[in-house]
C-alpha cells in the first residue's frame, strides 16, 4: 500500500483492545501500535510526580524521549530511547501515573506528534483512547470497544494472574473506575468514540466473536 492503511481501536481499560489489536495486526500483516504503552513508557521513564513538574522541566524531559516501532503483527516492538518496553510498564501504578500524565496538554501534544510520525510511514492498527478522535481522525476504519466495569476488572485480574502478578478484584474495580473517571472527564482529548466509529460492546461476547466482527468490517474498507 502506497498510503499507510490505519485502523484505530479505542476504548477503556479491560475491553480486550490489546489482544484484538495484535490479532488484527497479524491478520492484515500490519504493525501494532500500542499508544497506551507510549503513555505508560513516558510515565515510567520520567517517574512518579513528573506530572507536577514545571513546564520547562517537563518540556526538556519530553524532548529527550524517542519512540520507535519495528516489526509487524504481534511481533511489533515498541522501544523508548532504544529500550524495548515490556512488563515493567504494565503495573496498575504505572497505569495511574500514565493517566495523570495524559491530562497534561504538553504531554498529549508530544504523544500526538510522535504517534502521527509513526503512522506517516507505517500501515498499522493504533490502540488507545483517542486514536479515532484526535490522532488519526482520517483513518478509514475506526472501532470503539466497551464493556461493563466488573467484566473489565475480571479480565484484568486474569491477565495479571497469567503474568504471575498478585491482584485483588475489589482493588482492581476501584482502580479501573478511577481510571475511567480520569479518562472520560479530562479536558484534553477525553475518552469517547469518534462520530464514525463502529461501537462494539464486548461484555457478553467472546474474543473470537469480536475479532470476526472487526475483521468483517475492516475487509469492507480494504476492499
Curated annotation (Swiss-Prot):
Pfam families (UniProt xref):
Cytidylate_kin (PF02224)
Query: Highest taxon of the source?
Result: Bacteria
Chief localization class?
cytoplasm
The first-level EC class reads transferase
Originating organism: Maridesulfovibrio salexigens (strain ATCC 14822 / DSM 2638 / NCIMB 8403 / VKM B-1763) (Desulfovibrio salexigens)
Q: Which residue positions does the secretion signal occupy?
A: none
Name residues in a coiled coil.
Answer: none
By sequence similarity, the record places it as follows: Belongs to the cytidylate kinase family. Type 1 subfamily.
Subcellular location as annotated = Cytoplasm
What CDD domains is this protein classified in?
A: CMPK
Q: What is its EC number?
A: 2.7.4.25
InterPro entries the record matches:
Cytidylate_kin, Cytidylate_kinase_dom, P-loop_NTPase
- One MF annotation (Gene Ontology) recorded for this entry: CMP kinase activity
A Gene Ontology biological process noted in the UniProt record is:
pyrimidine nucleotide metabolic process
How is this protein annotated for GO cellular component? Answer: cytoplasm
Catalyses which reaction(s): CMP + ATP = CDP + ADP; dCMP + ATP = dCDP + ADP
Q: Which UniProt keywords apply?
A: ATP-binding, Cytoplasm, Kinase, Nucleotide-binding, Transferase
Protein name, UniProt field: Cytidylate kinase
Cite the Gene3D superfamilies for this sequence. Answer: P-loop containing nucleotide triphosphate hydrolases
**Which amino acids does the record list as binding ATP?**
11-19
Amino acid at each position: 500500500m502506497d498510503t499507510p492503511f490505519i485502523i484505530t481501536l479505542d476504548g477503556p481499560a479491560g475491553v480486550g483492545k490489546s489482544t484484538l489489536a495484535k490479532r488484527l495486526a497479524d491478520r492484515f500483516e500490519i504493525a501494532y501500535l500500542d499508544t497506551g504503552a507510549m503513555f505508560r513508557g513516558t510515565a515510567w521513564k520520567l517517574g512518579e510526580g513528573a506530572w507536577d513538574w514545571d513546564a520547562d522541566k517537563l518540556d526538556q524531559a519530553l524532548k529527550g524521549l524517542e519512540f520507535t516501532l519495528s516489526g509487524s503483527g504481534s511481533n511489533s516492538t515498541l522501544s523508548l530511547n532504544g529500550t524495548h518496553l515490556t512488563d515493567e510498564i504494565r503495573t496498575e501504578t504505572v497505569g495511574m501515573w500514565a493517566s495523570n500524565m495524559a491530562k497534561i496538554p504538553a504531554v498529549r501534544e508530544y504523544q500526538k506528534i510522535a504517534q502521527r510520525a509513526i503512522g506517516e510511514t507505517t500501515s498499522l492498527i493504533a490502540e488507545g483512547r483517542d486514536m479515532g478522535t484526535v490522532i488519526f481522525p482520517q483513518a478509514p476504519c475506526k472501532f470503539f470497544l466497551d464493556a461493563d466495569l466488573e467484566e473489565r476488572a475480571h479480565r484484568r485480574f486474569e491477565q495479571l494472574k497469567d503474568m504471575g502478578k498478585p491482584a485483588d478484584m475489589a482493588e482492581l474495580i476501584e482502580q479501573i473506575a478511577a481510571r475511567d473517571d480520569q479518562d472520560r472527564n479530562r479536558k484534553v482529548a477525553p475518552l469517547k468514540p469518534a462520530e464514525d466509529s463502529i461501537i462494539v460492546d464486548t461484555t457478553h461476547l467472546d474474543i473470537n466473536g469480536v475479532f470476526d466482527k472487526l475483521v468483517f468490517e475492516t475487509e469492507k474498507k480494504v476492499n
